[in-house]
From Swiss-Prot:
This is Protein Asterix. Coiled coil: none annotated. Signal peptide: none annotated. Keywords: Membrane, Transmembrane, Transmembrane helix. The chain crosses the membrane at residues 32-52, 78-98. One of its GO terms (cellular component) is endoplasmic reticulum membrane. Belongs to the Asterix family. It comes from Dictyostelium discoideum (Social amoeba). GO terms for molecular function: protein folding chaperone.
Amino acid sequence: MSDPRKESLIVERFEMRASTEPKEGELELYSLFSIIFGFLGIMLKYKICLWVSAVCCVAYLSNLKSKDSSVRTILSPVSLSLMGLVMAYFGPNSNLFV
């Protein structure tokens, strides 16, 4: 018996992989949002802004590659978000933070 499939209708299988790398400006946006929300949280005394800053900072650090890292780019968002959270919860006027 011969093969009933037609040779012209056979499609070869190929594997599609989704790109998991962050886009071009995504890392800079996480860093920028972390700094902006950190300043807003410290100046306006909003704890929610400080927590958003901390989440953006963690997202920035988790997607950071070794070739993009320098001390200044890592230290700015981390120090600002941590300083704001420490001031909000352990500062002398911590009961004023709403």
